[in-house]
């Protein structure tokens, strides 16, 4: 593989995370407008976004095998066609069934691109460099989280239809599509060059702990961010623009944190640092949902964004380091568990909001962060990442 191809594929990975971040994160911003569009209660409307999350889950789960059957370039081209059809469906239909189908298709497209993006980084880079590259790649998720709530707020504040937010997100896939046509992808499966057969390795208890941590982290994070706009407006008296800014502060700090930790992780044991970050994030989220001073929210959420930024990517990195040879199926398994957390976001938090309000939903997400801390702490006793020599300097 040429260096030109490596750089091009790395940029596809960056944009794949930006796409998924944009699709998932804008939900909290457009939810109320979509509910009004379909004349449904917000809590009921939130359930339809389960189709989005189910699409992501299905695509990530199946792509562990499909990557070896269907060439990566062909998958991305097919994804572009699906993206165009989904956005056109959102713009031209008033049917809730069509909306749900389009959300599912958007989820499938996001899941395909994110799993390909993650695989490319774990395939192209090794050891400590893999961890820092994954972190930088994941920072594009938070860049989208910074940019698209601002775009969504601007669109909604001007009384433009909510579906223009998704049209803007589609521009990211245009970039992925163009890059996919310009660069060569690694060949997998039967077409790949056969080297020496590698003995199958047992994944071990560490992978199970990381899988639970990934699920609880994503469920906690997206449940938190998904309801923060409503919590800020209904409980703390902010307007929609201020609420969008609070979400933007989180993702801006998240992005900065990723850049910082992509350098820091080179010098520290990833298991220890992820445990410390999970503890700090749990405490900061507790402070956020219990403060009565609205002016403090932006400062607390910036701290939360910064310290939680490296958790999920470090979980994936630690998972890939549990075996001597990086396994796409292992990485996709942890991604799938994280995606299950995405799918459960509104399934779990929607009924809590309906019965007990926004504060109770945020308290639930806080308890999920506490579980992440516990899993990372227990991982210290069983992790194999040091045994395989992955932590040697490169």
Curated annotation (Swiss-Prot):
It comes from Erwinia tasmaniensis (strain DSM 17950 / CFBP 7177 / CIP 109463 / NCPPB 4357 / Et1/99). Belongs to the major facilitator superfamily. TsgA family. InterPro entries: MFS, MFS_dom, MFS_trans_sf, MFS_TsgA, MFS_TsgA-like. GO terms for cellular component: plasma membrane. Pfam families: MFS_1. It is found in: Cell inner membrane. PROSITE patterns: MFS. This is Protein TsgA homolog. GO terms for molecular function: transmembrane transporter activity. The chain crosses the membrane at residues 11-31, 51-71, 76-96, 101-121, 135-155, 163-183, 205-225, 245-265, 273-293, 299-319, 333-353, 362-382. The keyword Transmembrane helix applies. It is a multi-pass membrane protein. Keywords: Cell inner membrane, Cell membrane, Membrane, Transmembrane, Transmembrane helix. Gene3D superfamilies: MFS general substrate transporter like domains. The keyword Cell inner membrane applies.
